[in-house]
Amino acid sequence: MENIETILRLAEEKILLVQNLKALQEYKVEFLGKNGIVTGELKKLGSLNEQERKEFGLKINKLKDKIQNIIRATEEILEEQELKLKLAADKIDLTIPARRYKQGSIHPITQCSEELIQVFSQFGFTIENGPNIENDFHNFTALNFEDDHPARQMHDTFYLKGQENNKPLLLRTHTSTVQIRAMKSGKPPFRFIAPGRTYRSDSDMTHTPMFHQIEGLVIDKNINMGHLKYVITEFIKNFFENSNIELRFRPSFFPFTEPSAEVDIRMNKHDKWLEVLGCGMVHPNVLKNVGIDSSEYQGVAFGLGVERFAMLKYNIKDLRQFFEGDMRWLKHYNFGSFDIPSLAGGLTK
């Protein structure tokens, strides 16, 4: 009995004076471990009779419970103290500037496309989309291309191995294919633009095998070149934010328009004329191919290269730089997310 009380006092003295969890663990092993003091007392049970063993065993268990309670209480106190010390050491200074958050930027082609779409939306144009892989009818035949037209040749067009109705499939060479699909599936009047990727077998400073186009179409009664000239003129002035910009319409030829014109611009009278887009009145054969009566409805169409307009507006010299992925170039020419114009009212996708 006296030995048990002595062990309890010794445990209280040692455990209550410890300063850290490591020392507490050492005392736990000393008193309650496999070879500890309390375990040593339990070994004495074998030398006692049944009644003494019962009484002594009860006392040893109470001693063990008291020591465990002391250790548990001390452990909670030490853990709280260590947590406070850790929080004090890891204290965050809220006045220190935060690390700069990395965020992406807007590619010039995306920026330019959104600006172009926004301007056209002001004239009531909606958006139509179509597939990148097309058949011969939508890409050539319906647009009044003759069978021997150079654009149909392998060196100009990317043909695929697959076929549709025994006709070759190809990567569309213009987004005029969208106009054909829209006119076949709907009824006039139409007023929409068709933005998207197009593909031609060409590569130099001003051409890439893949490029972005926006083509526009208006089909209605009593449409004439005057309407086309007005839309193109106002569009150019709005996009380049220059009301004094000069335009000229040069006679040209496209299979799908008649008459046809190419549009040149110059920012001031000392600059050279720069070709920016093609346009014209929709050819009667095109209207016939999509089931529209050309004696009742007329149309105007135009097409432009997004990269071309981006180069002119943002002063980019080489078309190929758009697709090279040079981080230094992108850092210089890219735009922040808040620079993208929101799509104006009346524009639908």
From Swiss-Prot:
PROSITE patterns reported for this sequence: AA_TRNA_LIGASE_II
Binding-site positions, Mg(2+): 258
Localization, UniProt: Cytoplasm
Cofactors: Mg(2+)
Reactions accelerated catalytically: tRNA(Phe) + L-phenylalanine + ATP = L-phenylalanyl-tRNA(Phe) + AMP + diphosphate + H(+)
A single MF term (Gene Ontology): phenylalanine-tRNA ligase activity
Family annotation (InterPro entries): aa-tRNA-synth_II (IPR006195), aa-tRNA-synth_II/BPL/LPL (IPR045864), Phe-tRNA-synth_IIc_asu (IPR004529), Phe-tRNA_ligase_II_N (IPR004188), Phe_tRNA_ligase_alpha1_bac (IPR022911), Phenylalanyl-tRNA_Synthase (IPR002319), tRNA-bd_arm (IPR010978)
EC id: 6.1.1.20
GO biological processes: phenylalanyl-tRNA aminoacylation
Subunit structure as annotated in this protein's UniProt entry: Tetramer of two alpha and two beta subunits.
Family: Belongs to the class-II aminoacyl-tRNA synthetase family. Phe-tRNA synthetase alpha subunit type 1 subfamily.
Name recorded for this polypeptide: Phenylalanine--tRNA ligase alpha subunit
Organism: Rickettsia akari (strain Hartford)
Gene from which this protein is expressed: pheS
